[in-house]
Amino acid sequence: MENPSPASILIIGSGVFGLSTAWALTKRQQFADTSITVVDDTSTGQFPPEDCASVDSSRIIRPDYADPDYTALAAEAQKEWRKQGDDDLGGQGRYNESGLVLTAYQDSLKLDAGIKSGMYYVKKSWENCVKVAQRDGEPADKIKVLGSTEALNSCLGTNTRPGDWGYLNSLSGWANASMGMKWLYNRVNATGRVSFVNAKAEQLTTEGDKVIGAKLSDGKCLAADVVLVAAGAWTGELIDLRGRVEASGHVLAYIEVSEEECAVLSKQPIVLNLTSGLFTVPPQGNMLKVARHSFGYLNPGTVHHALPLSPSLEREPIVVSKPYTNRDGIIGRLPHEADVHLREGLAKLSPIKGLEDRPWKKTRLCWYSDTKDGDWLVDWHPGWKGLFIATGDSGHGYKFLPLLGDKVLDCMLGKGGIYGQKWKWKDLEDESIGREVDGKFRGLITMDGSRGLPAGLVLEEELRRAPPIAV
């Protein structure tokens, strides 16, 4: 960082990365005289916008990771989630410690070289969670092995095949993500230190080898000493990150349940099968959510103003995977394969029979910002001065809300430690990933073992497949 106390910082994006970083900036004396601006495109004036990945009825809050570094970081964040005072992050229903059943199948699926299996992830996650629980003095029965399909069925009240091996972590839970982001926005706004601008950042502006701001959709320009891009799945439209970070869409749906059914389901843990990617979250009100944490849908499209890798290169049209949300138009239905798969999830993971036959009350695509290894990208751009990137959530950033902004700032200041190493800008191993090759888009695949099949699906192609399911 050229100036450790810049006069101005522009943050593009008000999701969990952007908003938590703004909050962290307001709390550090080093930035007491720094002007902080957050810009995002929101039709309602609400920050963050409703189609942001951080805004939803629920996000899983878990230390259950195959990587012990994330287990440790998530366990640290959970200390804040567990605080239940009205003004605390976890208060007023923002956090619920329902427990989590993590499971997978033993099936010998054909995975591409380098992709870890879901069962690998589950067993490593169990090992890491047990170690952290022992370290923190938690009772041994808080994490219980479910070593067979029968044991899983007994725990869940099902009579299906929810998995072949798994465990119940009673120390995990879920957060109402929309409520959590509202809590965070209110904290940031109350400081009086942050200016919020409702506009779309169309492109980054430069002067020589330095990024100096952003041009907005209304033609205005915002200037800053440091530009921090935290635009989630939209980051690839502003910066050429092909092969490093890629937008992928993930399906979720809601059905209506009765009061009697809700009384049963609200006592259930979250259930997540890492082979299929299917999971259910205990209901809120009378709405039950089922979703799929998979490799996701690609949506290739041309962008015209992405910042090239270095000042020696000209901006040119490139093809990247782009989010498609309600601001782009109403899809109106799920792809057929997603409809079938989500209903399979309800049938296998729920103790109540027949839920899979009900109509969807609501469906959505949640857009991740994926990386190959599941590690985020939080680093200075190597080709441009003044440009810091905080993206690549890979579908698992929200749970770190209480400390994410501080970790981003640590990386910005060159004090990121082991996480700075994980999240640094990485050289590409395959230059064809994230690009069109012979007319076909070669999507990035997250290979950490946390994703369920299928892989390589293109949204437009899947929507064309018969029969479409009206919702």
Locations of regions flagged by a protein language model:
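Short beta-strand to alpha-helix junction loop
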Residues: P68-A75, K116-Y121, Y167-N186, I330-H341
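C-terminal catalytic lobe of FAD-dependent flavoproteins
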Residues: V340-A470
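Active-site substrate-recognition segment that forms the wall
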Residues: W23-R28, G91-G99, C221-V226, A231-G386
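Glycine-rich FAD pyrophosphate-binding loop
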Residues: T26-A53
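Dinucleotide-binding Rossmann-like beta1-alpha1 core, especially the glycine-rich loop
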Residues: S57-S154, G163-D164
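Short hydrophobic core segments
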Residues: L10-I12, V39, A214, C221-T235, ...
